[in-house]
């Protein structure tokens, strides 16, 4: 879920608000639906995964049983290529390496800037500055860095309850 915190910032939504949770829910549902539809398309080309059984896969009480009716219909008709589709992996280093340091994981960044220490192959360490992507973009666009807008919040500035509410908003997807 790399970048959710920064995406909400760039949409002008404060992370710990009902509006941000609604947008995160919308994003999560979209990602889920597109992942399942892509797997159906792959099943059309290559067949369903070997142990696929539509009745068991779509039976009540499991994740796939909560999919929209039109997606379940496509799965029943064509099968699904991937037995597992969605997971949220740890994304701290991944966001730095591949996402230009967009907020890592589901939460907003823990800091707008920090120093990262990297061990080199020769055993020495190199320190370098890291800036959050949304913060850096705001600065580049001429934003007032002395007074960030209220939707710029770090993970440390929001309550544990707000973290929990965001997880609850996206967990069904």
Annotate each language-model stretch with its function.
Residues 7-9, 16, 96, 127:
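Short, electropositive, low-hydrophobicity segments enriched in small/polar residues
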Residues 9, 13-25, 119, 147-154:
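Glycine- and acidic
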Residues 13-91:
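Internal maturation/activation junctions in enzymes
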Residues 1-12, 172-173:
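Core structural elements
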Residues 61-62, 74-81, 86-173:
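Catalytic alpha/beta core of large soluble enzyme barrels
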Residues 2-3, 22, 26, 30-34, ...:
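Conserved active-site and cofactor/substrate-binding residues in soluble primary-metabolism enzymes
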């Amino acid at each position: 879920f790399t970048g959710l915190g920064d995406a909400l910032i760039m949409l002008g939504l404060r992370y710990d608000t009902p509006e941000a949770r609604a947008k995160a829910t919308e994003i999560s549902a979209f990602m889920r639906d597109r992942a399942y539809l892509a797997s159906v398309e792959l099943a059309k080309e290559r067949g369903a995964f070997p142990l696929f059984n539509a009745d068991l896969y779509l039976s009540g009480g499991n994740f796939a049983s909560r999919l929209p009716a039109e997606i379940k219909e496509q799965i029943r008709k064509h099968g699904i290529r991937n037995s597992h589709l969605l997971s949220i992996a740890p994304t701290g280093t991944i966001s730095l390496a591949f996402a230009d340091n967009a907020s890592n994981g589901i939460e907003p960044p823990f800091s707008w800037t920090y120093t990262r220490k990297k061990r080199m192959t020769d055993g020495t360490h190199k320190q370098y500055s890291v800036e959050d992507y949304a913060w850096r973009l705001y600065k580049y666009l001429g934003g007032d860095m002395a007074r960030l807008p209220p939707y710029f919040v770090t993970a440390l500035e929001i309550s544990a309850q707000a973290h929990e509410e965001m997880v609850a908003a996206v967990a069904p997807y």
